[in-house]
């Protein structure tokens, strides 16, 4: 109804508007049979512009009036009637009226819905109509450009001869129909009448009809069609052309700017060419394009002055327009330039070169993390790295990071996007990538939130491509379970987790067994180049040479096939100058998983065996593949071993090392069944010769908790049970009635086989019985005899976890393991591990299980396990206890690591290692303060002094001095107690690398020095999680490298054990089986002293190469480096600090004070049995094995 009224009104308005116009010209033209042209000058003497203008105004006012009248009528006539009661007689009439209104309402609603669908962009018809309206609007605008190119504003021309007006009229008829459709679809008719696009129609449609009646044209306000350009962004979105916010914003800015510019130019053109009213005699002739030029120059505030407004109306409009136009120009143009300049800088799609691999790196992308990653990934020591590194991050790089990318532009590319968006994954071609690496923020405030974000990234990657290889960094060990439970996660396909907490604590744990080992391993998997200098100290040059060593893999040449591992290692070291650490042993069955075996006992090299080497570069390791006996046997210079032309590589030649088999006897396999045991106790004559044999026997079979055996090269092999029993009895007398449980031999088909065919040299100090200064009485490590009454060793059975890799005990409550200061002070702890833990009750869990588990590896005998004493907040430890309750020999002192009384109570001066850890979250305010507690604790211990009393400085008795004069005798096993805190073995965990300068007061480290070059790190007394950054690159290039490193530092954690722990139930105990007990027979880390014992001969001016060969042949131990005093002078102010030398050359001179890092075999030999009879009174001075380091539970070893 409203639309009909509008149509009628529109026609009447046109007629009424024309009634006042002069029709004489029109009539004369109509009467002219020849259709002669107008006399233009006579026609234009009378201006008719107001007719065109009034038609537009009247149309607007008429439409507005109709809408207002309709609303008033609806308000008066259609008011809501009051509800009538059910019995009211007018109710029927009301119902009929309502039904009629509902029918009309339904009809109007359907019409409105139809019109709405027709003009919306949601349907195909709507999209076509919207695009058609835009195209016709632009076509009408082009017609205006054509008409406005002349300087005439009003022109007399017969309509039938005016082609442009005829075309424009056809367009306007279409716009009029579209106007009515929009009017019907509008929910608020009054507001619709006041819309901008409605005014465009008011001032463009009616004048086209007026021109027919007057036979003249007025340029008028047709330039308003330019405002239709503002709909370009909407139309492009309807057509799915614009999808990103930046492109939509750019289209909006450009369309608004151009629309306003062209519209304002049309107004200036109209006003200047018309002149000022009322006589219009000062017209300023300007073309439309000149006006366009004039406006852009004016808006940009340049204003050349070559074009300007002369009319009053033109100038007035310009004044007001500049207030808007200048602001728009100043805001829009910079934003447009920014969007155009940066829109596609890091967008687009990866263009892969044919045959070139690429990896995608995401997660925590900053200058620091990226620079560390690229420094290691693109290191020159690697073989030609033909891999492109693609970084994907949601934020654009800052200037520093952008500069880094430019310096590596040939191998690095950055894309802006998120790993959670499949479109961005498609852009960087994740499905074609070689691997996807996820970096973590090591300094984050919330480690669990950081891990959750990275795990979600892995889920997104695996959801997009489930066969892509993923290597991820995680902060917390307990979050590893969520990752392992992802269905498409498969470690067999190369997926790997680098858990920073697990590896960090594992490195620290191994340093408890062999101080300095954390530094050695960290340097091995980091790619570094070393440069020695004569200006530097000798110890610095020795250390730097070791930092240049890395771990590589290479396939062994056919020359090695069939020879034992020890023999192959000797050949590599002496001939190729390579250190062979481990080999990959393939499964016996086809398709079975291969495993990495470190220093395997009795394994022989098979064809295509992959070896793990320590060397300076990948080129050096190639010698292992190039080596050929026929071509290279006589070559003395290892650098000359190159690829030969020998074709007979398939035939295995007999190596000159084959005659060494007699020096490498096959190791004895220890059966899992219960062995025969000999319990002997008695008195034997004490001549010195027999005592020497007894001491050798005891120390050969009672190994230290630090991980090495105690036998000597000169000891006698026991050939029968009786001799062994007598010797054990004498040993029992020697060590204060300690009753050993001896497994001297086992019977196999009537023959007696010795427990281990490798002799055992003594290792670094530890906690079992040694001589003290009072008459050679033993001072075993552990708890005093009066503290051991609660432990019944005969009735307790020792168990392992279900995999057989770790010692296990039934769950203990935390309260049973808590000591107060008095209880700790009454406990003579020795050879133990003190963990100084700084934590608040709500601090994030760091996973203390990862520190204790390597110290509970099953390749230690039970009595060798070091007691772990944790000093810290018991409220925090209670949260960790669920993961510690099944691990034996743990005590907790609820105290402060900064309290000297607490430190004295736990005998920190007698410990084998003091670990200083912090679980507190670093502050954002000042990151350097994150390590304040750890540094204070370290300096506090170094400033302490201790009494030189019994049990502090253990000295050798005279009888022992006589024994040690022979080649076969052991060294003093117990670490001498420290009188000064500076000599306490210590390792401090740091969050910030730069804080390492505060640990040692006697060094001259520069704050800008890299961590690995600082003295505390070189000495193995500091460790920071940043050194683990290199593992990402190492794991990518060598899938087995992380497995090897994890095996070395975790004590034997396997993927199967990881899956068990991922269940969340913790370690599960298991019955010993043949398979699980065989897992005990694996290599471990140890430290051997050259001061005394069977290897002492090499300490006096010996060479490292001779030591290496002798240790490998005689004891099956693989030497990997030295731990040497920094100051080798005997001056009184010489430092007691040692530093790490990784894999010295074979001609390297040794010193008696050196300690050797070794990978030693498992010793299944004689077990140690604590006494059943209490020691005589004297108590703490004659401490026996208790629940301290050597006691606390069962020590019955079913596999000995």
Swiss-Prot record:
Residues 563-583 are annotated as: Segment S8. Residues 681-713, 746-785, 1170-1200 are annotated as: Disordered. Residues 70-127, 186-189, 236-250, 338-1200 are cytoplasmic. The chain crosses the membrane at residues 49-69, 128-149, 165-185, 190-210, 215-235, 251-271, 317-337. Phosphorylated. Phosphorylation may be mediated by both PKA and SRC kinases, which activate the channel activity. Phosphorylation by PKA is however unclear. Indeed, although modulation of channel activity requires Pka-C1, it does not interact with the whole PKA holoenzyme. Moreover, modulation of activity does not depend upon phosphorylation of Ser-978. Residues 505-525 are annotated as: Segment S7. A motif (Selectivity for potassium) lies at residues 301-304. Residues 356-498, 830-974 form the RCK N-terminal domain. InterPro entries: Ion_trans_dom (IPR005821), K_chnl_BK_asu (IPR003929), K_chnl_Slo-like (IPR047871), NAD(P)-bd_dom_sf (IPR036291), RCK_N (IPR003148), Slowpoke-like_C (IPR048735). Disulfide bonds: none annotated. Residues 1-48, 150-164, 211-214, 272-284, 308-316 are extracellular. It is a multi-pass membrane protein. The modification Phosphoserine is found at residue 978. It is found in: Membrane. Changing residue 552 to F: Affects the interaction with SRC. Expressed in muscle cells, neurons of the CNS and PNS, mushroom bodies, a limited number of cells in embryonic and larval midgut and in epithelial-derived tracheal cells. During pupariation and embryogenesis, it is expressed in muscles many hours prior to the appearance of functional channels. Potassium channel activated by both membrane depolarization or increase in cytosolic Ca(2+) that mediates export of K(+). Its activation dampens the excitatory events that elevate the cytosolic Ca(2+) concentration and/or depolarize the cell membrane. It therefore contributes to repolarization of the membrane potential. Kinetics are determined by alternative splicing, phosphorylation status and its combination interaction with Slob and 14-3-3-zeta. While the interaction with Slob1 alone increases its activity, its interaction with both Slob1 and 14-3-3-zeta decreases its activity. The S4 segment, which is characterized by a series of positively charged amino acids at every third position, is part of the voltage-sensor. This is Calcium-activated potassium channel slowpoke. The gene is slo.
């Amino acid at each position: 109804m409203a639309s009909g009224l509008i149509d009628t009104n529109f026609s009447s308005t046109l007629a009424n508007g024309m009634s006042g116009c002069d029709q004489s010209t029109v009539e004369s033209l109509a009467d002219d049979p020849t259709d002669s042209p107008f006399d233009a000058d006579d026609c234009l003497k009378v201006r008719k512009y107001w007719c065109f203008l009034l038609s537009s105004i009247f149309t607007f006012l008429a439409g507005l009036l109709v809408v207002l009248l309709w609303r008033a009528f609806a308000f008066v006539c259609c008011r809501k009637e009051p509800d009538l009661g059910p019995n009211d007689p007018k109710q029927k009439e009301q119902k009929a009226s309502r039904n009629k209104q509902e029918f009309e309402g339904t009809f109007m609603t359907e019409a409105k819905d139809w019109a709405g669908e027709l003009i919306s962009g949601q349907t195909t018809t709507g999209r076509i109509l919207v695009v058609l309206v835009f195209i016709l609007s632009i076509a009408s605008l082009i017609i205006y450009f054509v008409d406005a190119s002349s300087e005439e504003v009003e022109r007399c021309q017969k309509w039938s001869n005016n082609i442009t007006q005829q075309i424009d009229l056809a367009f306007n008829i279409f716009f009029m129909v579209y106007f009515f459709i929009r009017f019907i679809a509008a929910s608020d008719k009054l507001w619709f009448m006041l819309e901008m696009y409605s005014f465009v129609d008011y001032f463009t449609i009616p004048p086209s009809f007026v021109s027919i009646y007057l036979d003249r044209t007025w340029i008028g306000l047709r330039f308003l069609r330019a405002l239709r350009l503002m709909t370009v962004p909407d139309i492009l979105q309807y057509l799915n052309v614009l999808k990103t916010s930046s492109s939509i914003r750019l289209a909006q800015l450009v369309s608004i700017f151009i629309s306003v510019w062209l519209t304002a130019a049309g107004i200036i053109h109209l006003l200047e060419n018309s002149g000022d009213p009322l006589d219009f005699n000062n017209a300023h002739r300007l073309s439309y394009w000149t006006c366009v030029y004039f406006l852009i120059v004016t808006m940009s505030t340049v204003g050349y002055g070559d074009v300007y407004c002369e009319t009053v109306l033109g100038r007035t409009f310009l004044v007001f327009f500049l207030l808007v136009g200048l602001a728009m120009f100043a805001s829009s143009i910079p934003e447009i330039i920014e969007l155009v300049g940066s829109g596609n800088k890091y967008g687009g799609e990866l263009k892969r070169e044919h045959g070139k691999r690429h990896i995608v790196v995401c997660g925590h992308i900053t200058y620091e993390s990226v620079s560390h990653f690229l420094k290691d990934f693109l290191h020159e020591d690697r073989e030609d790295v033909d891999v492109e590194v693609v970084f994907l991050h949601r934020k654009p790089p800052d200037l520093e990071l952008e500069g880094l990318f430019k310096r590596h532009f040939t191998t690095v590319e950055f894309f802006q996007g998120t790993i959670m968006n499949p479109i961005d994954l498609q852009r960087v071609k994740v499905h074609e990538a070689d691997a996807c690496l996820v970096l973590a923020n090591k300094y984050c405030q919330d480690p669990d939130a950081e891990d959750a974000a990275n795990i979600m990234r892995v889920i997104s990657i695996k959801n997009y491509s489930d066969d892509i290889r993923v290597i991820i960094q995680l902060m917390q060990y307990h979050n590893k379970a969520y990752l392992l439970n992802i269905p498409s996660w498969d470690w067999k396909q190369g997926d790997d987790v680098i858990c920073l907490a697990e590896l960090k604590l594992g490195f620290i744990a191994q340093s408890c067994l062999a101080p300095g080992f954390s530094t050695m391993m960290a340097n091995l998997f980091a790619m570094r180049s070393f440069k020695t200098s004569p200006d530097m100290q000798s110890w610095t040059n020795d250390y730097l040479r070791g930092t240049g060593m890395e771990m590589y893999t290479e396939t062994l040449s056919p020359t090695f096939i069939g020879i034992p591992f020890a023999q192959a290692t000797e050949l590599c070291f002496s001939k190729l100058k390579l250190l062979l650490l481990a080999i990959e042993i393939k499964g016996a069955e086809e398709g079975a998983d291969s495993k990495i075996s470190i220093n395997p006992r009795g394994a022989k090299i098979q064809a295509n065996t992959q070896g793990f080497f320590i060397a300076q570069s990948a080129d050096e390791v190639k010698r292992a593949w190039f080596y050929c006996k026929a071509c290279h046997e006589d070559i003395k210079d290892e650098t000359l071993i190159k690829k030969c032309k020998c074709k007979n590589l398939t035939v295995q030649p007999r190596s000159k090392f084959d005659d060494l088999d007699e020096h490498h006897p096959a190791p004895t396999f220890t059966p899992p069944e219960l062995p025969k045991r000999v319990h002997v106790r008695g008195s034997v004559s004490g001549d010195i010769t027999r005592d020497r044999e007894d001491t050798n026997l005891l120390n050969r079979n009672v190994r230290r908790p630090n991980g090495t055996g105690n036998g000597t090269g000169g000891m006698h092999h026991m050939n029968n049970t009786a001799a062994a029993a007598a010797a054990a009895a004498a040993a029992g007398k020697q060590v204060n009635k300690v009753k050993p449980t001896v497994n001297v031999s086992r019977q196999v088909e009537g023959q007696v086989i010795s427990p281990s065919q490798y002799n055992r040299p003594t290792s670094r100090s530890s906690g079992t019985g040694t001589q003290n200064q009072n008459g050679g009485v033993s001072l075993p490590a552990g708890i005093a005899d009066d503290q051991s009454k609660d432990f019944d060793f005969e009735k307790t059975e020792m168990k392992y976890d279900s995999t057989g890799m770790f010692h296990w005990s039934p769950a203990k409550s935390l309260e049973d393991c808590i000591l107060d200061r008095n209880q700790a002070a009454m406990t003579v702890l020795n050879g133990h591990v003190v963990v100084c833990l700084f934590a608040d009750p709500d601090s994030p869990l760091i996973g203390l299980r990862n520190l204790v588990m390597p110290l509970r590896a099953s390749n230690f005998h039970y009595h060798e396990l070091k007691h772990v004493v944790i000093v810290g907040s018991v409220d925090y430890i209670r949260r960790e206890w669920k993961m510690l309750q099944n691990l034996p020999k743990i005590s907790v002192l609820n105290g402060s690591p900064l309290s000297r009384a607490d430190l004295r109570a736990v005998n920190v001066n007698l410990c084998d290692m003091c670990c200083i850890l912090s679980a507190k979250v670093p502050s954002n305010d000042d990151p350097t303060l994150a390590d304040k507690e750890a540094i204070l604790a370290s300096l506090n211990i170094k400033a302490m002094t201790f009494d030189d009393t019994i049990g502090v400085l253990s000295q050798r008795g005279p009888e022992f001095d006589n024994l040690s004069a022979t080649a076969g005798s052991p060294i003093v096993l117990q670490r001498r107690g420290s009188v000064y805190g500076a000599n306490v073995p210590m390792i401090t965990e740091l969050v910030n690398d730069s804080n390492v300068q505060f640990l040692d007061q006697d060094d001259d480290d520069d704050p800008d020095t890299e961590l690995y070059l600082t003295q505390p790190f070189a000495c193995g007394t500091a460790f920071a999680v940043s050194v683990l950054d290199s593992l990402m690159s190492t794991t990518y290039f060598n899938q087995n490298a992380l497995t090897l490193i994890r095996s070395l530092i975790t004590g034997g954690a396997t993927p199967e054990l990881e899956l068990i722990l991922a269940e969340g139930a913790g370690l599960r105990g298991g019955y010993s089986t043949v398979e699980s007990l065989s897992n005990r027979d694996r290599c471990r880390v140890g430290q051997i002293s050259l001061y005394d014992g069977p290897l002492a001969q090499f300490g006096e001016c010996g060479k490292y190469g001779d030591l290496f060969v002798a240790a490998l042949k005689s004891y099956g131990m693989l030497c990997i480096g030295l731990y040497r005093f920094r100051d080798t002078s005997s001056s009184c102010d010489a430092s007691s600090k040692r530093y790490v030398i990784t894999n010295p050359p074979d001609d390297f001179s040794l010193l008696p004070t050196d300690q050797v890092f070794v990978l030693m075999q498992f010793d299944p030999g004689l077990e140690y049995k604590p006494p059943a009879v209490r020691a005589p009174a004297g108590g703490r001075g004659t401490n026996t094995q208790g629940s301290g380091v050597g006691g606390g539970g069962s020590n019955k070893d079913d596999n000995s």
